[in-house]
From Swiss-Prot:
This is DNA-directed RNA polymerase subunit beta. GO terms for molecular function: DNA binding; DNA-directed RNA polymerase activity; ribonucleoside binding. Its EC number is 2.7.7.6. Gene3D superfamilies: 2.40.50.100, 2.40.50.150, 3.90.1100.10, DNA-directed RNA polymerase, beta subunit, external 1 domain, DNA-directed RNA polymerase, subunit 2, domain 6, RNA polymerase alpha subunit dimerisation domain, RNA polymerase Rpb2, domain 2. It catalyses: RNA(n) + a ribonucleoside 5'-triphosphate = RNA(n+1) + diphosphate.
Length: 1370
């Protein structure tokens, strides 16, 4: 075949200017890898890493009892095979999960009471069933109770330390107050903050604040130790002739000289008094050997002692540490003959006295008091003891069970504070606390930077695995409490591990997480793109995240670090804007949960082919060139200065300073945005709408891939998992609508494999959004397929490419007001050709229960119904497949026993004569709800185990079994044929060592004769092992090995299929009280109609306002009518010019197709067609491909291109205006793409030329059929007796205050009275009205509206005694 699927991608002309560097990573890897890391299902237990589930078990176990005489230890866990496969879970409404068993060891100790020595008494090991754990399907989803769900990844604040300030808002003076916060992964938060007096406070868990030194003292530091940690000291020398200080170059740099500094030998003045110590002056002093500097007494006064100053003779403390040096104290020091002492270096410029002031404000001296003070703050009301205070403090930050920074938190702490603590130390250390405080003080003193919490280095992603890991930990901790209690209540030595463990709490937590967590969502299955996008979504909401109300503008905003990591375009409109984002195309998530994006490495101005992934923190400070920077053939930058990004700024950087380069222009946008051609020409707001609306496109009956795409269509279709991809290379053996059989190439499969792939296609299944999932084969028998090729298209895919809409010819012009305000005028031809027809499948369920009054029964024998109503039901009471149904029709007949009523004597007599029948049951059949009209396409019946099966169930089972048997026979046939082929290769032509006879005793192969194919065919395969070959070693062994393998493979296949058949015939697990459940599926064909919403890919949306006959549409000179007319005013103010460029390029693509069609119709020579195609494509790759085709193949390609030549205009490197003009020229059109149009009604030409082209238009999920609704008589509200509202409740139309005014203005008094009484809540009036109509009288007698009674009761409840007095008018 000339255009196999593989070659089809060549047929899309690509305008990309940049060669592809790396492939886009698999789009749903974010889900799959995370869950794989969590379960480690393919890793042998002993090789498992300490992460995911393994880490959870290791962190909770061992569990010891209170007396420490027994411990329950964890060994390993294993996962079994799931009970049902994915398909069965869908059908039966089950959860796709694997049973988990955990091997635990119970160790019992003997403790010697005198010595306290422990010895092991007993060890018991056992595997304990630990509930089920949901498994992820191939496509990254979970099946919970039969529905597909997705766990959305959460973007939350990373653990670590964060510095911030209040921007001067807290205190009236406008002073900036700095604060630090240590956030662990789990555990207590620690906050440090300054107040307006520069005193440092600490809060634990946002409780009341206390001086920070209380915490530091509780850590065991004395006041002296703290002062010497946070401040440098100056040494003061005292003598009779004056005072000096030691010259410390580090401290001098910020000081002034108080007296002239003179060189001792030369007498030269090195620095005059009151001059700053410059670097040069300090250098000179060092050269002249000056180690001490003369100072005045004033300089020393007001300084603070850095340690106790002691009288050397008596040991008496003259000045205590942290005391101020006053004149009296200085005189005392001199008098006692002390020659040197140290003072704190505080200059109030670079070093402030805040920590010293805090120590003064803090009235607590010793560690013990500090611990008790902290205990009082955290547990007010509890009497503190030193032991309990110590235990509490220890548990707060230093106990790994209570406090966990996680590897990420430790990494961030080390990174910010420059520490070297190993990553596996995941609690706080004393040094951490000191360094956090030191950095905060430095920050206040003007060193260091505050953190930006919206930087992606400070936000990380928690994907499925991690979210589930946290839930599992919660469950295990709950279980741990129960186990400890059991261990202390019972004699442990008599127990086995399974007596202690009850896994219910764990299963319950997991079930709750998947069932009702905010991050576990019903998968958006409208089309393949919406599936992929849903799995790649990042949400800042959810448990442990933000809430909509609290999130400000900064969090929602686009941040420079989002580049290449999070899409700046795709986010919902409305209250969630910015809180829910999408991963960019090339982004991935590293093991720490940070989002990474790939860059090419640049060395010495030359771009290498190395690609490396960088997180937002690693990228800081690097200069990064754009992907479209000009380069020569060697990969050097052409321009000397290149536009680049560096630390969030856009700069011009010299080419030698560049370190990295983007890998692709579309690196910064998400999958949905990368599907919009000419995105660069659209306004961002409209691009946002465009990327969101593509997710709402309904799969159409006839998928049609876009003529103007971006080249991403194939990637999305393949990674979404809706199309069927070949698992191995091989040859297609057989194809029908529901399955494809591929015989695998011999070099592909191992000896154990069966050598056959059977792909069962999904036919007309219902998606979560009620759209239709259907797969169609795109290969023929005999085709050779490669591993990874698409062999069957799914919904919204066309030849392996995503196809969400249709290519239609559009004209931009007003037409009779029908395209006012974004309305769309559509040609009837689109409806007639089923271009926008979609199929929707509704599921209806009928349950027969065991009630108190007796069993409900599903049957066709329903009382008081005529033949007509039952004509489509079979004898089991279930509607036949293929029946056309409309609202009110019976789908499943069901009768329910009625409560016994008092019977009259006559009835009793009749019952006695005719037996109990019609009287005691009522009809509760499942009927078609209003607004549904379609064809029944399937029915499934689930019945209790052990219940009798009805004829319909048996028929369904037979059909399913036949299908399975056919698969089994095909597999056996193919592997048998393949084995026979191998054997014949070995045997034919060789000479036989023994003679072989057939059943009748006739010799088929004589001894010594050459073995022929005919002879082999005459012997049944199971007797081929009797054949022996002479003269060649090893052949007999090979033959018997092949036959043995064949037999084993056949046995395996039979075993697997028998198991499937057994499952079919087994009863179903139904909820308690349910006897039988029937599900009926109805397919509804929805044609395009007025009121349906349609949209382009550029945010240009509208509603169909009129469907015009084809002959009335504006037409071109050659008589071709346009298919859609859009309003030209929809473009300028919205600034989405991309739609015009798309229209122009689409017009060229269509025109080229028409030219090829003309050539084919006029039988142009093949070379002429080939030349034209080469001219259009203009790539050497395509030239080679076209040259490799023979004439027939070339004609096939040309036929495929008649509908138009598909183009790819990738995002940010799309077709230029020149290229579009040249394409229009090749199509033989005017460069402006404007055409003279004629009015379809009058035949007159329109005054001006009109822009006409081909646009890709989608039909969205907002269909008028789902919204339109009318009520006759329906349910009423209980209290007010007014009709309910809304389609779901079969409600009425609200008539509000303004509508009443309108009726009053018209003077329509009686109509209004009717609206407000009998048509609404006048209960008696409603009945009278009904009676009047039945009797044929047409009089209106309105009574009291029920809402009046409600009002009176309301007033009475306010103790106002209001009553209605009734009387005659006179």
């Amino acid at each position: 075949m000339a255009y196999s699927i593989a070659n089809n991608q060549l047929l899309r002309k690509n305008f990309a200017k940049i060669k592809k560097i790396i492939d886009i990573p698999n789009l749903i890897d974010i889900q799959k890898n995370s869950y794989k890391r969590f379960l480690q299902i393919d890793t042998p237990p002993e090789a498992r890493k300490n992460s995911g589930l393994e880490a959870v078990f290791k962190s909770v176990f061992p569990i010891k009892d209170f007396s420490d005489t027994a411990s329950l230890e964890y060994v390993t866990y294993t996962l079994g095979a799931p009970k049902y496969d994915v398909e069965e879970c869908h059908q039966r409404g089950m959860t796709f999960a694997a049973p988990m068993k955990v091997k635990v060891r119970l160790v019992v100790w003997d403790v010697n009471k005198d010595t306290g020595v422990r010895s092991i008494r007993d060890i018991k090991e056992q595997e304990v069933y630990f509930g089920e754990i949901p498994l992820m399907t191939e496509n990254g989803t979970f099946i919970i109770n039969g529905t597909e769900r997705v766990i959305v990844s959460q973007l939350h604040r990373s653990p670590g330390v964060f510095y911030d300030h209040d921007k001067g808002k807290t205190h009236s003076s406008g002073k900036v107050l700095y604060s630090a916060r240590v956030i662990p992964y789990r555990g207590s938060w620690l906050d440090f903050e300054f107040d307006h007096k520069d005193i440092l406070f600490v809060r634990i868990d946002r409780r009341r604040k206390m001086p920070a030194t209380v915490l530091l003292k509780a850590l065991g530091y004395s006041a002296e130790a703290l002062l010497n940690y946070f401040y440098k000291s100056e040494e003061i020398l005292v003598a009779a002739e004056g005072m000096w200080k030691k010259a410390d170059p580090e401290l001098l740099a910020s000081q002034k000289a108080s007296v002239d500094i003179v060189a001792p030998k030369t007498g030269e003045v090195l620095l005059k008094a009151n001059r700053k110590f410059t670097k040069a002056a300090i250098r000179k002093m060092t050269e002249h050997g000056i180690t001490q500097i003369p100072i005045t007494m004033e300089e020393v006064l007001g300084k603070y002692a850095s340690n106790d100053i002691v009288d050397p003779s008596t040991g008496e403390v003259i000045v205590e540490c942290n005391d101020e040096i006053t004149q009296a104290r200085l005189d005392d020091i001199k008098a006692k003959g002390i020659t040197e002492f140290k003072v704190l270096f505080i200059d109030n410029l670079h070093v402030t006295s805040s920590l010293r002031d805090t120590l003064i404000a803090d009235k607590i001296a010793a560690t013990e008091e500090a611990l008790i003070e902290i205990y009082r703050r955290l547990r007010p009301g509890d009497p503190p003891t030193l032991k309990s205070a110590q235990a509490l403090f220890e548990n707060l930050f230093f106990n790994a069970e209570r406090y966990d920074l996680s590897a990420v938190g430790r990494l961030k702490l080390n990174f910010k504070l420059g520490l070297n603590v190993p990553l596996d130390c995941q609690t706080l250390t004393k040094d951490d606390v000191l360094e956090v405080v030191r950095y905060l003080i430095d920050l206040k003193n003007g060193k260091g930077t505050i953190d930006d919490i919206d930087h992606l280095g400070n936000r990380r992603v928690r994907a499925v695995g991690e979210l589930l890991e946290n839930q599992y930990r919660i469950g295990l901790v709950r279980m741990e409490r129960a186990i400890k209690e059991r261990m202390s209540l019972q004699e442990v030595e008599n127990l086995m591990p399974h007596d202690l463990i009850n896994s219910k709490p764990v299963s319950a937590v997991v079930k709750e997480f998947f069932g009702s967590s905010q991050l576990s969502q019903f998968m958006d299955q409208t089309n393949p793109l919406s599936e992929v996008t849903h799995k790649r979504r990042l949400s800042a909401l959810g448990p442990g995240g933000l809430t909509r109300e609290r999130a400000g503008f900064e969090v929602r905003d686009v941040h420079p670090t989002h580049y290449g990591r999070v899409c700046p375009i795709e986010t919902p409109e409305g209250p969630n804007i910015g809180l829910i984002a999408s991963l960019s195309t090339y982004a991935r998530i590293n093991e720490h949960g940070f989002v990474e994006t790939p860059y090419r490495i640049v060395q010495d101005g030359k771009v290498t082919s190395d690609v490396k992934f960088f997180s937002a923190l690693e990228e800081e400070g690097h200069a990064i060139a754009q992907a479209n920077a000009e380069m020569d053939a060697d990969g050097r930058f052409v321009n000397e200065y290149v536009s680049a990004r560096k630390s969030g700024e856009f700069l011009l950087v010299h080419r030698d300073e560049l370190e990295l380069m983007d890998v692709a222009p579309m690196q910064l946008v998400s999958v949905a945005a990368s599907l919009i051609p000419f995105l660069e020409n659209d306004d961002a707001n409209r691009a946002l709408m465009g990327s969101n609306m593509q997710r709402q496109a309904v799969p159409l009956l006839k998928a049609d891939s876009p003529l103007v795409g971006t080249g991403m269509e194939r990637v999305v279709a393949k990674d979404s998992g809706v199309s069927v991809v070949a698992r191995h290379t091989g040859i297609v053996e057989s194809v029908d609508a529901s399955r494809i059989v591929v015989k695998i190439d011999e070099d592909e499969f191992d000896e154990t494999g069966t050598g056959v792939d059977i792909y069962n296609l999904i036919k007309f299944a219902r998606s979560n959004q009620n759209t239709c999932i259907n797969q169609r084969p795109v290969v023929k028998v005999g085709d050779h397929v490669k591993r990874g090729d698409v062999i069957a298209d799914g919904p919204s895919t066309d030849m392996g490419e995503l196809a969400l809409g249709q290519n239609v010819v559009v004209a931009f012009m007003p037409w009779g007001g029908y395209n006012f305000e974004d309305s769309i005028l559509v040609s009837e031809k689109l409806v007639k050709d089923d271009r926008y027809t979609s199929i929707h499948i509704e599921e209806f369920e009928c349950v027969a229960r065991d009630t108190k009054l007796g069993k409900e029964e599903i049957t066709s024998d329903i009382p008081n119904l005529g033949e007509e109503a039952l004509k489509d039901l079979d004898e089991s009471g279930i509607i036949r497949i293929g029946a056309e149904v409309k609202p009110g029709d019976i789908l499943v007949g069901k009768i329910t026993p009625k409560g016994e009523t008092q019977l009259s004597p006559e009835e009793k007599l009749l019952r006695a004569i005719f037996g109990e029948k019609a009287g005691d049951v009522r009809d509760t059949s499942l009927r078609v709800p209003p607004g549904v009209e379609g064809t029944v396409i399937g029915a499934k019946i689930f019945s209790r185990k052990g219940a009798d099966k009805d004829s319909r169930t048996e028929m369904i089972e037979r059909m399913e079994e036949d299908k399975l048997r056919k698969d089994e026979q095909d597999e056996i046939r193919i592997i048998r044929n393949s084995a026979v082929g191998k054997l014949k290769k070995l045997l034919v032509g060789k000479s036989a060592a023994v003679k072989v006879e057939d059943k009748s005793g006739r010799t088929v192969i004589a001894k010594g004769a050459a073995i022929t194919e005919e002879a082999l065919d005459a012997i049944p395969l199971d007797r081929w092992d009797e054949i022996s070959v002479s003269g060649e070693a090893g052949v007999d062994e090979k033959v018997s090995a092949i036959l043995q393998t064949l037999q084993q493979q056949i046995d395996i296949i039979r075993y697997v299929f028998d198991d499937k058949v057994q499952k079919l015939k087994r009863g179903d697990d139904l909820p308690p009280g349910v006897i039988k459940m029937v599900k009926v599926y109805i397919a509804i064909k929805r044609k395009l109609q007025v009121g349906d919403k349609m949209a382009g890919r550029h945010g240009n949306k509208g509603v169909v306002s009129r469907i015009l006959p084809e002959e009335d549409m504006p037409y071109m000179e050659d008589g071709r009518p346009v298919e859609i007319v859009l309003n030209p005013l929809g473009v300028p103010s919205r600034m989405n010019v991309g739609q015009i460029l798309e229209t122009h390029l689409g017009w060229a693509a269509k025109g080229i197709g028409w030219k090829i069609e003309e050539m084919l119709e006029s039988y142009s020579p093949a070379d002429h067609i080939k030349g034209y195609l080469k001219d259009v494509y203009g790539t050497t790759e395509m030239d080679t491909f076209l040259d490799s085709l023979d004439k027939d193949e070339l004609m096939n390609v040309a036929k495929r291109l008649q509908r138009g030549v598909a183009m790819a205009s990738p995002v940010f490197e799309g077709a230029s205006e020149e290229q579009i003009r040249s394409m229009l020229d090749k199509a033989g059109f005017d460069e402006t793409a404007q055409v003279s149009l004629y009015d379809g009604k009058s035949g007159e030409p329109f005054k001006h030329k009109v822009t006409v082209g081909v646009m890709y238009v989608l039909k969205l999920h907002h269909l008028v059929d789902d919204k339109i609704h009318a009520r006759s008589i329906g349910p009423y509200s209980l209290v007010t007796q007014q009709p309910l509202g809304g389609k779901a409740q079969f409600g009425g139309q609200r008539l509000g205050e303004m509508e009443v005014w309108a009726m009053e203005a018209y003077g329509a008094a009686y109509a209004l009275q009717e609206f407000l009484t009998v048509k609404s809540d006048d209960v008696a009036g409603r009945t009278r009205m009904y009676e009047a109509i039945v009797k044929g009288k047409h009089t209106l007698e309105p009574g009291l509206p029920e809402s009046f009674n409600v009002l009176i009761k309301e007033l009475q409840s306010l103790c106002l005694d209001v009553e209605l007095l009734e009387g005659d008018e006179d």
